[in-house]
């Protein structure tokens, strides 16, 4: 009988020792552990003692564990730790966010100011392009590229302002030449600035003149070419002692 009691008591002591050894290891993740928390507020709190089994010791253990939990709760909410509680964290975040916002806004202002200054200098930069110069669009300054895409548009409808009928002026070659391209295409209303009804009348006038054969369809009118000093005229090498006011066309015939 005594031997069985000794065996049971030794087995119980081994179980308690094994429980104490396993309790020393924590299963909490190191990333979730609370760092740098002072233990002054709960250093003297009683700990749970597994070696005693009396009712008084159980009451003391329950009181100690509840005191420990309350100390931890107060410590986390008061922000006494180095990481701070919720209020201190919010305050620090607001201060830090305000500083970051101020620095970012200052950087944006400096960037915009430098961009405006560089654009002003680039707009003041002008270059004289000569005939035959080869350049790419990226070589132009903003001042030089301004207005390249959009053409010149009439401010008002010329037909309504002057009050004439385009269909009655189909023999007016100067009027027709203003509303067609050098290759005989009718200009768009975006370029002419005419209303839709007047644009249709102008188009009908141009087609009528070309259809009757009184206006060329692929080049400017001969009268306009004759009075202009364009590339179609070639200078005539005149010998000494002769008049130098003559010019000849591509056919080799004298214009005058």
Swiss-Prot record:
Please indicate if the UniProt record lists Transcription regulation as a keyword: no
Q: Which Pfam families match?
A: Ribosomal_S18
Annotated GO CC locations: mitochondrial small ribosomal subunit
Q: Is the Ribosomal protein keyword given for this protein?
A: yes
Biased composition, class Polar residues, residue ranges: 21-30
Keywords carried by this UniProt record = Mitochondrion, Ribonucleoprotein, Ribosomal protein
Alphabetized InterPro entries for the sequence: Ribosomal_bS18, Ribosomal_bS18_sf
- Spans annotated as Disordered: 19-106
Q: GO terms for biological process?
A: translation
Q: Where in the cell is it found?
A: Mitochondrion
- Please note every region of biased composition (Low complexity): 44-66
Which GO MF terms does the UniProt record name? small ribosomal subunit rRNA binding; structural constituent of ribosome
Q: What does this protein do?
A: Component of the mitochondrial ribosome (mitoribosome), a dedicated translation machinery responsible for the synthesis of mitochondrial genome-encoded proteins, including at least some of the essential transmembrane subunits of the mitochondrial respiratory chain. The mitoribosomes are attached to the mitochondrial inner membrane and translation products are cotranslationally integrated into the membrane.
Q: How does it assemble?
A: Component of the mitochondrial small ribosomal subunit (mt-SSU). Mature N.crassa 74S mitochondrial ribosomes consist of a small (37S) and a large (54S) subunit. The 37S small subunit contains a 16S ribosomal RNA (16S mt-rRNA) and 32 different proteins. The 54S large subunit contains a 23S rRNA (23S mt-rRNA) and 42 different proteins.
For this chain, the family text in UniProt reads:
Belongs to the bacterial ribosomal protein bS18 family.
Name used for this protein in its record = Small ribosomal subunit protein bS18m
Q: Which organism is it from?
A: Neurospora crassa (strain ATCC 24698 / 74-OR23-1A / CBS 708.71 / DSM 1257 / FGSC 987)
Q: Print the organism lineage.
A: Eukaryota, Fungi, Dikarya, Ascomycota, Pezizomycotina
Report which gene this protein is encoded by.
Answer: rsm18
């Amino acid at each position: 009988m005594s031997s069985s009691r000794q065996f049971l008591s030794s087995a119980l002591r081994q179980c308690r020792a094994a429980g104490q050894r396993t309790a020393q290891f924590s299963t909490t993740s190191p990333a979730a552990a609370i760092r740098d928390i002072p233990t002054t507020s709960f250093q003297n709190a009683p700990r749970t003692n597994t070696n005693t089994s009396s009712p008084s010791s159980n009451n003391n253990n329950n009181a100690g564990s509840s005191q420990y939990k309350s100390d931890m709760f107060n410590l986390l909410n008061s922000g006494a730790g180095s990481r701070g509680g919720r209020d201190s964290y919010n305050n620090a975040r607001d201060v830090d966010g305000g500083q970051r916002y101020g620095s970012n806004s200052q950087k944006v202002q400096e960037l915009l100011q430098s961009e405006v200054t560089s654009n002003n200098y680039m707009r003041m930069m002008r270059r004289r392009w000569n005939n035959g110069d080869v350049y790419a669009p990226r070589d132009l300054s903003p001042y030089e590229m301004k207005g390249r895409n959009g053409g010149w548009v009439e401010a008002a409808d010329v037909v309504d302002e002057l009050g004439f009928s385009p269909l009655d002026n189909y023999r007016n070659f100067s009027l027709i030449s203003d509303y067609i391209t050098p290759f005989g295409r009718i200009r768009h209303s975006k370029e002419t600035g005419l209303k839709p009804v007047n644009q249709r009348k102008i188009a009908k006038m141009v087609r009528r003149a070309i259809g009757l054969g009184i206006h060329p369809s692929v080049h400017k009118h001969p009268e306009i070419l004759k009075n202009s000093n364009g590339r179609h005229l070639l200078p005539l090498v005149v010998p000494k002692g002769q008049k130098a006011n003559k010019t000849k066309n591509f056919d080799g015939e004298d214009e005058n």
